Amino acid sequence: MSDNSQNLLYDKFELPKSVKMMTVEGSGGSIDKHARFVAEPLERGMGHTLGNALRRALLIGLEAPAIISFSMTGVLHEYMAIEGIIEDVTNIVLNLKGALLKKYPFQDSEDGRRPQLLKSMISIDASDLAACGGQRAVTLADLLQEGGFEAVNPEHVIFTVTQPMQVEVALRVAFGRGYSTSERIILEDKGVNEIVLDAAFSPVVLVNYFVEDTRVGQDTDFDRLILYVETDGRVSPKEALAFSTQILTKHFSIFEKMDEKKIVFEEAISIEKENKDDILHKLVLGINEIELSVRSTNCLSNANIETIGELVIMPEPRLLQFRNFGKKSLCEIKNKLKEMKLELGMDLSQFGVGLDNVKEKMKWYAEKIRSKNVKG
């Protein structure tokens, strides 16, 4: 029987420190509906793993309000015309399907996620018609006189009036996800002349993701995940990504509850401002100044690696390519670097150090440190 009381130690995973959000070309700099997110570095393969999971959650998991039914004075069914209104009821229904409403069903709110009936009285007299050239467009904003819903497209025309009239319009709004046909929507208190609509709840219009190569130090075997998200404005792309992440976390937590050993991960070496000088002092040390076996020292010397800086910038696979450099030497070097709180494949770019200039930079930093000590 396995002992589940002890944690398992796993090697570190390279993870992004943050997710960058950028505007999309052609969106006018707006991130209300279009945004691109970049996460790097990720371990090889994790770009596609996360990208596909997030894409599916974004497309099927998010909720938003939508109109699920409407009724109107004088309207008996969907297949009729209304005197004094240009559009027939079928076209009014189509226009209502294009209405975009925004509201967050907060946990502590009085209404929560319950469907709400929004009633509005539309009164149009002769002077209103005259001011509009004989035709007065009734927009989505005109129909949202109560309920606390915000119109994403307030100028969206629902119907057009050509003669003075007073009509009451009632819209039933519900929260949901995905797409529901009118046949699937069940209203417990449905009115006699209430017309049920198909409802598009999902606020996400399009999601694409791309995976590119990126580097950590000199190692290019990592993924960069680029995620493009377009919404209809009922939620922003940033909100959509945050909500979908929480949805995935909720589902993954089911599998985390299995009674098995827990994993803890080794932490990656982080070069912070407060220990930058301390790390530099270690990087300029000569290979012969640390306690390595003669075999390992000779292997590094034959590879023309003279300083710790030249060593730690090397990715592990690169070291194994050197002549006579085997797993035993690699293990010894990794353990020694770990004692020094360093590791192979470190990113030294903040010191201006790359694989092409590391030898010159280490000499320059060593001289700078010596000069500073002399002055001190």
Swiss-Prot record:
It comes from the Bacteria. Coiled coil: none annotated. One of its GO terms (biological process) is DNA-templated transcription. GO terms for molecular function: DNA binding; DNA-directed RNA polymerase activity; protein dimerization activity. The keyword Metal-binding does not apply. Gene3D superfamilies: 5' to 3' exonuclease, C-terminal subdomain, DNA-directed RNA polymerase, insert domain, RNA polymerase, RBP11-like subunit. Residues 276-376 are annotated as: Alpha C-terminal domain (alpha-CTD). GO terms for cellular component: cytoplasm; DNA-directed RNA polymerase complex. Residues 1-259 are annotated as: Alpha N-terminal domain (alpha-NTD). Its EC number is 2.7.7.6. InterPro entries: DNA-dir_RNA_pol_insert (IPR011262), DNA-dir_RNA_pol_RpoA/D/Rpb3 (IPR011263), DNA-dir_RpoA (IPR011773), RBP11-like (IPR036603), RNAP_asu_C (IPR011260), RNApol_insert_sf (IPR036643). Keywords: DNA-directed RNA polymerase, Nucleotidyltransferase, Transcription, Transferase. It catalyses: RNA(n) + a ribonucleoside 5'-triphosphate = RNA(n+1) + diphosphate. Pfam families: RNA_pol_A_bac (PF01000), RNA_pol_A_CTD (PF03118), RNA_pol_L (PF01193). HAMAP family: RNApol_bact_RpoA (MF_00059). Homodimer. The RNAP catalytic core consists of 2 alpha, 1 beta, 1 beta' and 1 omega subunit. When a sigma factor is associated with the core the holoenzyme is formed, which can initiate transcription. DNA-dependent RNA polymerase catalyzes the transcription of DNA into RNA using the four ribonucleoside triphosphates as substrates. Belongs to the RNA polymerase alpha chain family. The N-terminal domain is essential for RNAP assembly and basal transcription, whereas the C-terminal domain is involved in interaction with transcriptional regulators and with upstream promoter elements. This is DNA-directed RNA polymerase subunit alpha. The gene is rpoA.
